[in-house]
Amino acid sequence: MNGMTDQMKDLIGMLPTAPTTYAQLVYNSELLDYQAEQVLLMGDSLTQISPEQMHIKVIDANRAALEAGAQSAMIGYKQLLLNEESLESGLTLLNAVYQSTQNQAANGLATQSQVLSARQQLESTQATKLTLTANEQKLRQTLCTMLGWKYDAVPEIRDVPAADLARIDGMNPEKDKQAAQDNNFTIRYNVLDLDNKDAGSVEYQNLQRTIKQEKEEVSSSLVNLYNDVLQKRNELQTAKAAYELEKTKMETAERKWQLGTIGRLEYMQQQNSLKTKEIAVKTGDLALFQAMETYDWAVKGNLKLSQ
């Protein structure tokens, strides 16, 4: 009995955790930021805002935010699809566990409590799958409307490009910080705003200090974003190594299965483990691609500052 319970825990423990709607949160955040920018603009005195400032605030900053938000939503959509694929593999395994537990219970080798536990795990994962599918459909509709389609359109959504490791070689926070500072929308706006202040006034001096602090924040943020890229690269390499090891285990399981030296559940467990490692590689690739895009967007000026 205890062996069966332990086996079930091992099998269930290999299933993926419930995913988050990361891309939806990103998109909502970008949309709220866009609306906030409009409110801030309305609160300013229009007589003190130059056409260049208005263009930066209304056009440049919001365009970049929406483009970056659409990219993040696309990446998040692909992540949801990967999570669905992982759940499908997990459901296949859990269904087999449930059927096996029922059979063992019929032969007096498992308790009704164990049967109930297996069924609850299966039903819980099925419910998660339904929620995930609903989130995927909602996010697809969001993507369609963001990109100019009707919400119920069915355009082909292709894969996100694979992360190009060569891009990392071209990243250098020390060299890129000048461009990031010069391009930053907040800094550009405030630099132009200096023209509206009386040189030597308290407001002028305060704004000068603010701009200096903002430039320092850009520099430190760029270093953090670069470090995140490196971390995501390491995580991807680790995931790839784990996947290669799991493929070797799968080959061994294949031979044992053909020889009849392992049971069906053990074989399915190895299949699910391989699928989990495969999806971890794809997830790591998406995460690295997102990290590189975030760094590049910061260099282009799309970096929110705390000032």
Please describe what each predicted stretch is.
Residues 1-72:
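Short flexible linkers and secondary-structure junctions
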Residues 52-55, 59-62, 80, 84-87, ...:
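Long, non-membrane, amphipathic alpha-helices that form coiled-coils
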Residues 133-175, 292-307:
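Short, solvent-exposed, mixed-charge loop/turn linkers that connect secondary-structure elements
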Residues 177-181:
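Polar, low-complexity export/assembly segments characteristic of proteins
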